Structure formats: C-alpha cells, structure tokens
Amino acid sequence: MQKSKMFFEDFEVGLVIKTGSKKITKKEIISFAKNYDPQDFHIDENKAKKGPFGTLVSSGFMTLGISFTQFFETGVVKETSMGAWGIDELRWTYPVYPDNELKSEVKV
C-alpha cells in the first residue's frame, strides 16, 4: 500500500509508484539541451534531420530529470528525502520526441 509519506523501511520489494504525466515541448527540449546537452539532434531541427533519429529528440538527462520530478511530486518522499545516493544502472531505450507525453512507474 502506498502512503503519502514514506521512510526507507516502508518501501517493500514489488511496490510500484505511478506518476502523473507531462507533455514534452520542442521549446523545453531545445532550452534544456542548449544549457546541458548541446548536441545537434537536441538543439537544431535542421541538423537533427541528418542525425541518428532523423528529427529533434530530448536529452536523456532531461527525461531523467523529468522522471525524478514526477516521482518527487507524488509526495511519497517529499518530507522524508535524505538526498539521492546514486543510480546503479540507467538506460535510455527509446528516444523522446517533441509532444510526447511522459509518465513514470517507480518499482522497488
């Protein structure tokens, strides 16, 4: 059972926390990438057409940040967070395009 305020010992293996969704805009993709991941396929529509995805795509680091924000906004650890210790394994298996909608499922 998901509580609104959870401590480390409250997280049980198999627990799934679902988040709300967020639509990713072209403007957000370009703005984030210009500051933090300035690869052509994130910041320039014309150059992106010649890139590996054939169009503009979001930075994986942007999608990671959005996923974390979505989890935090569930309120589960808002009052109990002690910071993040790190990520052992992370893979971006699909590109995120402008106007895609992202939602997250966090599984313990």
For each feature predicted by the language model, list its residue ranges:
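Hydrophobic beta-sheet segments that form the core/acyl-binding groove
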Residues: G83, D88-V108
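Hot-dog-fold acyl-thioester-processing enzymes
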Residues: M1-G86
